[in-house]
């Protein structure tokens, strides 16, 4: 039964697990906000919106985007549903995908050692959300919220322009970084913070300050390589997991934060009282918004259940190792939604 406490040192590393992707990539979805069983507002795609999760070799069949919702708890220290080694975060985002019965592909439940009878009705992607104050700007005013809730986007998003460089400190695909030419956080940038081959280069062999960095997807000594979490140089060693926030860059989800702030502050959403109530806010989302950048989508996967009634036990969970940060205002706004 989900959720669970994930014990990282008991997890088995499998190199053949696929990267988490979506089809079509970076598709903007029109969504409306509904009452998630008096637990959390959820963003559901409008009719005709088709987006599928891609996890080749892990799940067969077509799993269509069903909703995005965020959970939080009574305290900031214990808000996420899942935990890792007993540690929680203030919130947890869930991207829910349901088997598309309109397709001709019958899903099979794929065990890590091969397929077995039965199938998963759902694939749920879980993301640990941290909260922060820096870098999120002033609280959006009513005029900005009105603009956002009509499906418009701010000028600078995760693929836009950053602090001081031409293509952005946090531009997921930007080449140029915070103050320099070759990009601290460019997904495809060749050169990183201190080295020739880049802290965040997808294929860079060298890490932040050392020879064998964690974050080169194809680097020699990454998180799951020769000197990984349980290897000779362990979690706190030169080549271990904790070189930079557990081997991850914590993405500031600025655009998502403003969308959630505005949606949760909306009068009708705040006054949800009945299961099934909905407010037709024309919010445009992409599933990438609450996720870490592509190269940081390392994950734990297990078979469990939905965490809300009917608690169906046919769910493939894909829980991201790397965290994402949203504004503290999101947490406060979500807690003010009536009935939650």
From Swiss-Prot:
MF term (GO), any:
zinc ion binding
Can the keyword Magnesium be found in this entry's annotation?
no
Q: Which cofactor does it need?
A: Zn(2+)
Q: Which Pfam families match?
A: Carb_anhydrase, Collagen
Spans of the sequence repeats are 162-164, 165-167, 168-170, 171-173, 174-176, 177-179, 180-182, 183-185, 186-188, 189-191, 192-194, 195-197, 198-200, 201-203, 204-206, 207-209, 210-212, 213-215, 216-218, 219-221, 222-224, 225-227, 228-230, 231-233, 234-236, 237-238, 240-242
Annotated CDD domains? alpha_CA (cd00326)
Which cysteines link up through disulfide bonds? none
Q: Which InterPro entries match?
A: CA_dom, CA_dom_sf, Carbonic_anhydrase_a-class, Collagen
- Renumbered to this chain, region (Disordered) spans 138-249
Entry binding sites for substrate: 307-308
The EC class name is lyase
Listed GO cellular component terms? extracellular region
Can the keyword Repressor be found in this entry's annotation? no
- What function does this protein fulfil? Acts as a negative regulator for calcification in the shells of mollusks. May function both as a calcium concentrator and as a carbonic anhydrase required for production of carbonate ions, which are assembled to CaCO(3) at mineralization sites. Is important for shell formation in both the calcitic prismatic layer and the aragonitic nacreous layer. Shows inhibitory activity of crystal formation when present in free state but, when attached to the insoluble matrix, may regulate the form and size of aragonite crystal.
**Protein name as annotated:** Nacrein-like protein C1
Give the species: Crassostrea nippona
């Amino acid at each position: 039964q989900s959720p669970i406490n994930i014990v990282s040192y008991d997890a088995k590393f499998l190199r053949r697990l696929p990267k988490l992707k979506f089809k079509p990539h970076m598709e903007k979805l029109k969504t409306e906000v509904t009452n998630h069983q008096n637990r959390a507002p959820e963003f559901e795609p409008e009719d005709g919106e088709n987006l599928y999760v891609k996890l080749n070799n892990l799940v067969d069949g077509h799993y269509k985007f069903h909703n995005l919702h965020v959970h939080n708890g009574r305290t900031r220290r214990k808000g996420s549903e899942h935990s890792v080694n007993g540690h929680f975060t203030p919130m947890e985002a869930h991207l829910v995908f349901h088997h598309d019965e309109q397709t001709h592909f019958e899903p099979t439940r794929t065990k890590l050692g091969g397929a077995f009878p039965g199938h998963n009705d759902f694939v749920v992607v879980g993301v640990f959300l941290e909260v922060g104050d820096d870098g999120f700007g002033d609280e959006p005013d009513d005029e900005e919220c009105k603009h956002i809730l009509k499906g418009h986007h701010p000028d600078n998003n995760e693929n836009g322009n950053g602090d001081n460089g031409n293509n952005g400190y946090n531009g997921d695909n930007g080449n140029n970084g915070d103050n320099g030419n070759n990009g601290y956080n460019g997904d495809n940038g060749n050169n990183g913070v201190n080295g020739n081959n880049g802290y965040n280069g997808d294929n860079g062999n060298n890490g932040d300050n050392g020879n064998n960095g964690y974050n080169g997807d194809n680097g020699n000594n990454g998180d799951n390589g020769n000197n990984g979490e349980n290897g000779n140089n362990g979690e706190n060693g030169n080549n271990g997991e904790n070189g930079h926030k557990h081997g991850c860059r914590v993405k500031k989800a600025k655009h998502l934060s403003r969308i959630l702030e505005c949606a949760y502050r909306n009068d009708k959403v705040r006054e949800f009282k009945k299961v099934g109530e909905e407010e037709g806010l024309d919010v445009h989302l992409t599933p990438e918004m609450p996720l870490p950048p592509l190269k940081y989508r390392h994950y734990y996967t297990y078979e469990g259940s939905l965490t809300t009634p009917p608690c169906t036990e046919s769910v493939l969970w894909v829980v991201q190792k790397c965290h994402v940060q949203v504004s503290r205002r999101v947490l406060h706004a979500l807690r003010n939604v009536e009935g939650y």
